[in-house]
């Protein structure tokens, strides 16, 4: 894949990548698929090789979904905390694979776990990124009733990122589920307001609202296609941009 050699030619120089837990399990029903995680790590390395500063927020849905557990009777706050622990497992797994490729990586958790990763401290996270280390944010926001999408938006804003890249199972935002509706319309660009008004399920409303308030653009794309992250950051490939 041909890369842009001059970082100054790129509009976005500091990015946050949101990776769902489901993306890490590949074709499995649960857990991790190593080859899939390795491909994601290789894709991230391509972005680093462009000279960008990279942060990541990872979900935990491949291991545990707090909202689903709450639906069957578990206390929602307790279920969400378990889900946060799942994101730490995923972050450590991704870190291990990335470091095997020579990528300097740090995991910072919103829930302190001193034996396995660093606690989230904003200044420390920014310093890691300045040193070209990839920072993986785990533990969501550290609070129940908040999604990892909300955590991704908050961390992107705190790190002064230029854009949030949301890696999904489809190649952008549609007016309905393209897996169920073959005639679903895809948007190349769409406003925050239209995402909220049309109840599009790309992110929860709170996350979109915070992104809008802070003018953080969001680019939605498919993580299934190898090399897609670097293409998308260079305005190539298939994606949808959410902005004002």
From Swiss-Prot:
Q: Does the keyword Transferase apply?
A: yes
Q: What regulation of activity is recorded for this protein?
A: Inhibited by UTP.
Question: Where is the secretion signal located?
Answer: none
Q: Name one GO molecular function term.
A: ATP binding
* Binding annotation for ATP: 18-21, 61, 65, 168-169, 174, 177
Reactions it catalyzes: UMP + ATP = UDP + ADP
Please tell me where UMP binds in this chain: 60, 80, 141-148
- Tell where it localizes: Cytoplasm
Cross-referenced Gene3D superfamilies: Acetylglutamate kinase-like
Write down the EC number: 2.7.4.22
GO terms (BP aspect): 'de novo' CTP biosynthetic process; UDP biosynthetic process
According to its record, what are the GO cellular component terms?
A: cytoplasm
Q: What is its main location?
A: cytoplasm
Its annotated pathway reads: Pyrimidine metabolism; CTP biosynthesis via de novo pathway; UDP from UMP (UMPK route): step 1/1
The cross-references to InterPro entries, in alphabetical order and at most eight, read: AceGlu_kinase-like_sf, Asp/Glu/Uridylate_kinase, Uridylate_kinase, Uridylate_kinase_bac
Function, in words: Catalyzes the reversible phosphorylation of UMP to UDP.
Q: Which family does it belong to?
A: Belongs to the UMP kinase family.
Protein name, as recorded: Uridylate kinase
**Organism from which the protein derives:** Rickettsia typhi (strain ATCC VR-144 / Wilmington)
